[in-house]
């Protein structure tokens, strides 16, 4: 069996980064913070995380990813990521109800990974031409063009979508943390919580008014 010692993983990161024992604060932009965050989200079968780990189970062609080890995100998910396993359990607990999933990041351990997690577990990227009732999601991050952002927000907030029939899940990055309102949301999941409670409340405020 494959056992993950997350404490050991993070200690190794700190050692590699030469972090001083008396250091009190760590910049959110530092590689230590990002690596620790990646490792806390998922550690892959080869005991890697972040970009290296992500690349071990996906191949990329252009802008599209292909999952080459599906078990990691499906049947074996709980072994490699209790966080993502719990997220999926909560989303699947109900057959309807709008969901907002927030990540600080886009690449590898962020919105890209959440998208692939949902695709591997029976959800579909929203398409007006090929709808999947209560099983569709959209990605609302820096890679989403402005026109599509406005369209997704309008559809998600429409009366017809109060229970998630058209778009059930929005996967959002920091561009959703201010000035945007998502209506009729029943679940809010923040993948990487901030130390600052006001920032967490700000994110929750996108969906709770």
Tell where the protein language model's regions lie, with residue ranges.
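Helicase motor interdomain insertion/brace
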Residues: 1-184
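Short conserved active-site loop signatures built around small residues
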Residues: 188
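Conserved SF2 helicase motif VI
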Residues: 196-209
